[in-house]
């Protein structure tokens, strides 16, 4: 059925998953920092992150990916040359995680900013009145409440990141796209293996939808009843 390429394709699929999960973790971290920066009273912080999100959303992902990848490579080689060290090539997986995380960190910034703004201020004021510290307010009030509003955006961003991992094959990463391309060229069946690649991504997104639906229900427990 896969002409002996099942092992290679499976390995490529695992690489794709690893890339997607690692990238979304980095993007979430950047997004939380960015949302905090845009909501802070510090005007400089707000301007920096506003410029970051505007730049990222205004330039195509592939162009940004190539700029970041080659920019990192040039910067690294400049530093190593100054130190008298030979050229160092950036690992495609590391490059992919950094580029995807940096790009989609901008989208997560807007997702989290909107979610934090949707949390009723009365909840925070009540927690403060009960003597909660700022850390406790964030962990026990703001974060759980924010997640209910953020999950649809998180799910959408995750799906986009998952599909955008296909672009990283251009950087030399041996992911599922690269594996199916290799299989297609070797067997003279490129269309068939393109379908195989599409089916694998469809399975990933379908399973992701189920997980996200579960999380949305989990964070909405008691909310609908209270709204009624």
Curated annotation (Swiss-Prot):
Question: Listed GO cellular component terms?
Answer: ATP-binding cassette (ABC) transporter complex, substrate-binding subunit-containing; membrane; plasma membrane
The UniProt entry, under InterPro entries, shows: AA_ABC_transptr_permease_3TM, ABC_transp_permease_HisMQ, MetI-like, MetI-like_sf
Q: What is the annotated localization of this protein?
A: Cell inner membrane
Q: Which residues lie on this side of the membrane: Cytoplasmic?
A: 34-58, 109-148, 216-228
Keywords, alphabetical: Amino-acid transport, Cell inner membrane, Cell membrane, Membrane, Transmembrane, Transmembrane helix, Transport
Residue spans, topological domain Periplasmic:
1-12, 80-87, 172-194
Please list every transmembrane segment annotated in the UniProt record, as residue ranges.
13-33, 59-79, 88-108, 149-171, 195-215
Record flagged with keyword Cell inner membrane: yes
Q: Name one GO molecular function term.
A: high-affinity L-histidine transmembrane transporter activity
Main location (coarse class): membrane
Its placement in the membrane is given as: Multi-pass membrane protein
Among PANTHER family, the record links this protein to: CATIONIC AMINO ACID TRANSPORTER, MEMBRANE COMPONENT (PTHR30133), HISTIDINE TRANSPORT SYSTEM PERMEASE PROTEIN HISQ (PTHR30133:SF1)
Family, similarity comment: Belongs to the binding-protein-dependent transport system permease family. HisMQ subfamily.
- What does the record note on quaternary structure? The HisPMQJ complex is composed of two ATP-binding proteins (HisP), two transmembrane proteins (HisM and HisQ) and a solute-binding protein (HisJ). The HisPMQ-ArgT complex is composed of two ATP-binding proteins (HisP), two transmembrane proteins (HisM and HisQ) and a solute-binding protein (ArgT).
Q: What is this protein called?
A: Histidine/lysine/arginine/ornithine transport system permease protein HisQ
């Amino acid at each position: 059925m896969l002409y002996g390429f099942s092992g290679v394709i499976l390995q490529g699929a695992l690489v794709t998953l690893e890339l997607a999960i690692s990238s979304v973790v980095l993007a979430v971290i950047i997004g939380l920092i960015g949302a905090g920066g845009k909501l802070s009273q510090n005007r400089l912080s707000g301007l920096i992150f506003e410029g970051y999100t505007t730049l990222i959303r205004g330039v195509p992902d592939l162009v940004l990916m190539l700029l970041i990848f080659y920019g990192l490579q040039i910067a690294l080689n400049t530093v190593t040359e100054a130190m008298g060290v030979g050229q160092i090539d950036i690992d495609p997986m590391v490059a992919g995680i950094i580029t995807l995380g940096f790009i989609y960190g901008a989208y997560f910034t807007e997702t989290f900013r909107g979610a934090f703004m949707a949390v009723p201020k009365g909840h925070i004021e009540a927690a403060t009145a009960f003597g909660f510290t700022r850390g406790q307010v964030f962990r026990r009030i703001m974060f759980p409440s924010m997640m209910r509003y953020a999950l649809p955006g998180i799910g959408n961003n995750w799906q986009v990141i998952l599909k955008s991992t296909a672009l990283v094959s251009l950087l030399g990463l041996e992911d599922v796209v690269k594996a199916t391309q290799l299989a297609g060229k070797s067997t003279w069946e490129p269309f068939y293996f393109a379908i195989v690649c599409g089916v694998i991504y469809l399975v990933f997104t379908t399973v992701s939808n189920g997980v996200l639906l579960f999380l949305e229900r989990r964070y909405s427990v008691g909310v609908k009843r209270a709204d009624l």
